[in-house]
């Protein structure tokens, strides 16, 4: 008998399937907990305002409304989802506990209401304190009971209700505790408990939720249906409430706060109402594939659906979704399923009213007799829009109502007005296509978002506005959207390196004069800087602390809400807010949300004006404003200017203009008395003989809210002989005789910053200044304005006219002060000598750094009394040492010049003597470097009194090196360029010795280094090698041609110099000492002795600028003394041989027989004809 292949349509509610019956029971029993939870979420989102209203609202909504039988439904909801029943005893105990909490809370509210009506009544204050304490104790006990082992998951929905009540109670104590008569210490204790319990309750809810969800993970679609229902319903009953716990922080949110939930939940009538699910292969993962990955929030704008016929059944076959982001820009998605544009049914297109409800008509089609396979699909669906009862349909409406799964937030009104969620997106899962003999299903999956997530990111002027970071409209490169941890109400933005997170389009409903402060809720594995921009203009920049360890979990306690103290205002009603981060790499930074907090500053205008007037008047010596006070620095004037600029135009425009003119006058007076060239750092190294000179790694940066003008940043250095430096010379023509001058400025932060003032002596300070945030809360965050100008209107900004740090009578400055100053005394002035004053800022350590500005060098006072006598003594001592130095220099210069001249053939210095070798050049160079005071010992780039004669001789030394290198036909014979030009076999190294020489190290007998050299046949060459042998065996340097004509230089550890043998010689006999000395005397003479001390130079010679009264220690510069070539360490031997090639090519080979062979240099020099 043939099988009946006629398809049979089986209504979804007529199957004898116990699992479907359970699902129906879950919907009926789970509706009340969903209704109550959604109402609570609506209340927390909209009614969370200061006052006792929250407490009374919670009682009216939940604790005074829910009966014991209804509390039982909360327990039953999760019991059915996880198929775990709570024992009757524990169920009754939990319900009794909940009822007891409601009674205790009601008594507390009665006392709170009576106190509110008569807050000065002592008895009522005591009553509310007692009843608060009783309810607090009851909640602590109850919440512990709701964590009963093995029953944490079914008790979770009542746990979160009790936790929410406890946080609300503690918030009352923080807000009203002092009014109840609690001391401030007790109030602070309650506040600390509140913050700690927010994190503890959050973590318990998340851990329990994740455990329950993971327990439901399975393999088939039936298991996915239960998994998704648990995820959806506990998001509504637990996670959404937990996401609002941080708003109970009464000190962070003292006014009404607007929050948004951006997470998505899913429904699919095809899967969740299917009577056949377990037999679909890998159905769980296929259904989960319909859940969208993390993304920036979007809003469905249009939906087109096409039908598909599967085994004679017409079902939803595919669709096309178009959305818009929060900036209104369109987003087009790939086609879902099979899409036929010609047969598309228009569901929504450019309609601002979203769908709040679907009425689905799923179909489950089973084959004929003997055919167990099914076709599952959606035969039709109706979509109902908000604000109206109008329905748009795909083919027809059905009876599966999404409101049964996601109820309205208020059942008392029309659902199109009191809906809780809107349809945000539609995805599609499909299995497996047209394959005979298998199940086939087409399942649209509806994604829903909470109605609190508005499309336009509205910022209200009178409340705190929280905007989730995923509501950005533009994600910058390097930023990603990641799945939220569950307690943030949505997903997060993440970066692992410096850059911009995203751009957020915001809409301002209040006046543009309203000012705001920005806060960021973030988690980070590193200290970092956040910066913000509005419409491309910088607004804020500030340092923020690490909140978690790298690799740690995203827990509630790892998130921190912190912000910028300086307020700002928007210039346009519709603006783009940009958030970025810097100063870190290879770490993790997560952004949850941005908060805009109104800055109520109008009441401060009067006190601001009074403060600014006082500060301006304190700048001048008299009311006539003819002169500045001596202790008024340029930095002080800039800060007073900030005070004036921050005055309200609406309140005191005329006074502001008047004060601004006075401050400008003060600034001009300050500039006039400042003897520095370019004090505002317009450039460095712009003019050879004027202004600032500095190392190339110094940067000039525009003013921020620490500096109003430009400032410089000096980084650290890896070599103290090459420090980071900045200097300037004050010309003699600007100085007055017998006068004290002062260098002063402001240091934002520094480490190992050295400051010098040099004339007869060296005044020296090493200044370590911690960052501005560690001393007082100077703002370091904000730059704002239509032209990018900094906004320095921080409310904590203070200017103290008495704040100074000046050195008096030779006393040094106090270290670690942001304000610094150094004094220096000038004696007799001489324009011809032009001694002047050198100002030097230097850093010579790797960890050193400095940011400084507002530098001034100004006349302080004439010298009198002891100060006058001291500078005269210093001047005389300096002149005596100057004369002594001149005599010494004459001797050293003569010797050095003779040594240099002896290198060359004539006074044109264009040819070397035939017997000039590298040792002789080194010796001459060392003598040149004995000339003292060629450069200042404090900074070797500044020329000293002997700079001219030193540079004259040093130039000739460089010429000698160049001529010598040109004469050596072996390339890179000193290994300064590593192994360039050398052929290597085996393992060898080039090492830099502590005398700054590079040497070739041959550590193995099988290694060989060679070079092919082009020569002139018939001409004579000298092969000269300086080397050192360690251990047994011999080191050999061989020169040969293709066939024969081989010579060798051999080195061993037990002979100073080796005998030279013809190529056929196989023995190595030692030189005697006399033979070795004589063999090299013609070309090495003077090498060793050239480094001996010259008896004509005093051994205790000291730099001439040293003055004990002013300088600690001598001003010697070890880097200066180390200049020039240093001798080789003991043990190195120089040997040479004469070689006459017969062809135009020779090979030079370096090797050894055992031990280690170290070669300093290899030279092949053409003999003079």
Curated annotation (Swiss-Prot):
For this entry, list what GO says about its biological process. sporulation resulting in formation of a cellular spore; symbiont-mediated killing of host cell
One annotated GO molecular function: signaling receptor binding
CDD domains, alphabetically? delta_endotoxin_C
Indicate whether Lipid biosynthesis appears among the record's keywords: no
- Keyword Ribonucleoprotein annotated: no
| Coiled coil, from the record | none
Q: Which UniProt keywords apply?
A: Sporulation, Toxin, Virulence
Q: Name the InterPro entries on file.
A: Cry1Ac-like_dom-VII, Cry_V, Galactose-bd-like_sf, Pest_crys, Pest_crys_dom-III, Pest_crys_dom_I, Pest_crys_N_sf, Pest_cryst_cen_dom_sf
Signal peptide from the UniProt entry: none
Describe the function of this protein: Promotes colloidosmotic lysis by binding to the midgut epithelial cells of insects.
Q: What else is known?
A: Toxic segment of the protein is located in the N-terminus.
Instruction: Name the family.
Output: Belongs to the delta endotoxin family.
Task: Give the protein name, as stated in the record.
Answer: Pesticidal crystal protein Cry1Fb
